[in-house]
Amino acid sequence: LTDDHKSLLLNIAPGTYQLQIYAENIGRITYGPEILDNSKGLFGAISLNGAAIENWKMIPLLVRETSVNELTFGDKKEGDSPCFHKGTFEMNTPKDCHISIKGWGMGELWVNGEYLGAYWEENATQSVEVPASVLKQGKNEVVLFELKNNSQRSVSLSDKPVYK
């Protein structure tokens, strides 16, 4: 859903379902006249076939506090977003480096269970810094929580920051 497209049509068979909606809140306006109308989230009645849904709850998704070591990973289909991705890379001698997120959308990144920061395709910087202290000789694990682009399948390492 967007500011311009405020409804969602679901074609599903009759039954009992649980609907989960993720509302991201990045990108607040910090200048100009729009600063007065800079709300994020769901507004107004939430309805199904014109009838208001009641007793629904909103909870924060505290992904930055998530212990990625406790997650279970499975196969993902195109369009399964948001979702977590996990991969590994080898490093002979741990040193400061950057993980390029070119081709990814927006999300959060961990290396060896250590949260390193957020990334967004709209930013000039297209990489996340990885300090040598987080890395190990041999196999290292990278986890991404991707909000937009589930079709991407790889990241790359760079000695320098990556820019648009």
Which residues are covered by each model-predicted region?
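Aromatic-lined ligand-binding clefts that engage carbohydrates, nucleic acids, or primary amines
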Residues: 19, 89-112, 119-120, 142-145
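Terminal leader/tail segments of proteins
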Residues: 128-164
